[in-house]
UniProtKB/Swiss-Prot annotation:
Any matching Pfam family: Globin
Tissue: Red blood cells.
Organism: Aotus trivirgatus (Three-striped night monkey)
Record domain Globin: where: 2-146
Subunit field text: Heterotetramer of two delta chains and two alpha chains.
Positions bound to heme b: 63, 92
CDD domains: Hb-beta-like (cd08925)
Residues modified to Phosphoserine: 50
Effect ascribed to mutating residue 120 to N: In allelic sequence
Protein name stated in the entry: Hemoglobin subunit delta
């Protein structure tokens, strides 16, 4: 991912304020509500029958935290996203058979959640930088599929 020095600084500064557990749970929950076909990968999570059930599901929240933990690792290694996400790419491709388009969808949902949580602080320039990052992460996660 190519970010300018200013973009890297802005992304890092905002990410330092992110509550990974809260934002991760909301982002994954919204993915499952907005794109319900993604729920098939989470059948073991129990109740996903309504938006309230999804958003209140402790397994969704826990996995969302785990996902954003991995995203945090990516932010620390922006110059080597493919290497950083190689094992996760292999897992999601070979064992879980996740459609790689879902990575792009989750990235876009994450950007929406960040905008909702940070309001005016999440400027259009910061959004543009985060869009580059989530696109890079999605590409890295889809790498094993190619």
């Amino acid at each position: 991912v190519h970010l300018t020095g200013d973009e890297k600084s802005a992304v890092a500064a905002l990410w330092g304020k992110v509550n990974v557990e809260e934002v991760g749970g909301e982002a994954l929950g919204r993915l499952l509500v907005v794109y319900p076909w993604t729920q098939r990968f989470f059948e073991s999570f129990g109740a996903l029958s309504s938006p309230d059930a999804v958003m209140g599901n402790p397994k969704v929240k826990a996995h969302g935290k785990k996902v954003l933990g991995a995203f945090s690792d990516g932010l620390a290694h922006l110059d080597n996203l493919k290497g950083t996400f190689a094992q996760l790419s292999e897992l999601h491709c070979d064992k879980l058979h996740v459609d790689p388009e879902n990575f792009r969808l989750l990235g876009n949902v994450l950007v929406c959640v960040l905008a909702r949580n940070f309001g005016k602080e999440f400027t259009p320039l910061l959004q543009a930088a985060f869009q580059k990052v989530v696109a890079g992460v999605a590409t890295a996660l889809a790498h094993k599929y190619h």
